[in-house]
């Protein structure tokens, strides 16, 4: 049982053997999140190709009032298997420019030919 605000790491009883060049990503189930406030703390959880242990999922109950019970066999997460490319990083003195530059969080979509909605009413 996950009490409100509690987190716990749950064993799935499953293990996989991914081939080199692939990774698996453990993600929340949308129904658990929408209906019960259950999510995965480190979403997505990454499973590397070399890992051979039991898949475990750290769940968090974000509901402020209701506990959530988990039984053996419950579907608590989804697994996405995806090909991955190993990047090789090269140190450089500077980076080429881009339309976004160094603008950070919340800046995507601004200054790209969109009209300003500042002062507009809905």
Task: Indicate where each model-derived feature is located.
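Helix-rich terminal scaffold detector
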Residues: 75, 85-122
């Amino acid at each position: 049982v996950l009490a409100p605000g509690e987190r716990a790491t749950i064993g799935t009883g499953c293990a996989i053997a991914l081939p080199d060049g692939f990774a698996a990503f453990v993600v929340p189930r949308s129904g658990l999140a929408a209906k019960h406030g259950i999510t995965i703390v480190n979403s997505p959880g990454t499973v590397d190709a070399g890992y051979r242990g039991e898949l475990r999922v750290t769940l968090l109950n974000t509901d402020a009032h209701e506990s959530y019970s988990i039984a053996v066999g419950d579907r608590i997460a989804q697994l996405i298997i995806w090909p991955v490319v190993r990047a090789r990083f090269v140190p450089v003195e500077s980076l080429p420019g881009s339309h976004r530059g160094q603008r950070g969080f919340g800046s995507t979509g601004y200054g790209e030919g969109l009209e300003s909605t500042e002062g507009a009413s809905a």
